[in-house]
Amino acid sequence: MWKIMRSWKCGGMRWAHRQRPSHELLSQLSFDQHYKIRSNIELLIQDYASKPIAPLNYEYFLQYRPPLTKKEEYMLTIKTINLLLSLTCKRLNAIQRLPYNAVINPHIERTNSLYLKSLQTLLSIAYPYELHNPPKIQAKFTELLDDHEDAIVVLAKGLQEIQSCYPKFQISQFLNFHLKERITMKLLVTHYLSLMAQNKGDTNKRMIGILHRDLPIAQLIKHVSDYVNDICFVKFNTQRTPVLIHPPSQDITFTCIPPILEYIMTEVFKNAFEAQIALGKEHMPIEINLLKPDDDELYLRIRDHGGGITPEVEALMFNYSYSTHTQQSADSESTDLPGEQINNVSGMGFGLPMCKTYLELFGGKIDVQSLLGWGTDVYIKLKGPSKTALLSKK
């Protein structure tokens, strides 16, 4: 089912990858030839965009485990490329269906061009020979990651600029799908690269791609709290905020994707620490309660004493179009908290909505309960793979 065209014929002229610069080739085309090429590209995008994609789950990440055979490497490569092609084309299709005044926005146009470049990178893979050349595939996937590093920031600026003429509900809906598929693409690529590295024996034996078999939760929480404390000290010149973990004597481990939990805890801590600092209560501990009722479920409660959240803010906290922060100046970027450039872009709050997207991707959830004048409790439910799936050998 996997098809990649190395070259194609149009109007008697044959085009091959890396033959000549594209601008030279395009300048020699007649209008009809140019139209046919554009039409073929549109048909390709529509074809891949129409392919159904099963939701990403832990079973996908557990399909292949190091050490991989040559056949497993080959099959993993094909599956990853197929999924990336479909996701890239779905994003291109979604952007092109935006209203005209949105598509011509320079930031949104730049995002569209970025996804076209990603499509070109994926289509440039020579079938079938480069599928058996992991270093080349890894180089192309690394290029994809690098290209999309600031993609959300760029897109958010564009959407912010068209807010006055495009309904906020539709912007939020567009971002929901975009972020979910963007996160899926990143997870697919990083999982592939991690598996290839582990296949050489280069990494932690407790890892299966990006999945950690037994992540020490208290250790990760301490790492994140130390980091956010350091940044708060630089930014606000305040004392360190203590973090208490209950139960203190039990080191709970859980199977999950560490960067996802790290991002979520960073965002929650950022809000909790800043709220307490604003009230002069940085000396009061942030309380963390852990509960693991089953092998594939973990619950966390993060309690702060930052005075709570007003009902007006609480009703909007999961909206992309809402942020409690004003736009920051460029000279403050060196003291931004982790991910803050994404979490607050041109007045658009991305932190909690992205946490929600990450959690719901794998069957988890996040709830916030606030008592105005006192503090806020954040409840996080994490879902992991079942013990049967984790122990099964495929």
From Swiss-Prot:
The keyword Nucleotide-binding applies. It comes from the Eukaryota. Gene3D superfamilies: Alpha-ketoacid/pyruvate dehydrogenase kinase, N-terminal domain (1.20.140.20), Histidine kinase-like ATPase, C-terminal domain (3.30.565.10). SMART domains: HATPase_c (SM00387). The keyword Transmembrane helix does not apply. GO terms for biological process: protein-containing complex assembly; regulation of acetyl-CoA biosynthetic process from pyruvate; regulation of glucose metabolic process; regulation of mitophagy. Inhibits the mitochondrial pyruvate dehydrogenase complex by phosphorylation of the E1 alpha subunit (PDA1), thus contributing to the regulation of glucose metabolism. Also involved in telomere maintenance. Present with 4220 molecules/cell in log phase SD medium. Belongs to the PDK/BCKDK protein kinase family. This is [Pyruvate dehydrogenase (acetyl-transferring)] kinase 1, mitochondrial. It comes from Saccharomyces cerevisiae (strain ATCC 204508 / S288c). The gene is PKP1.
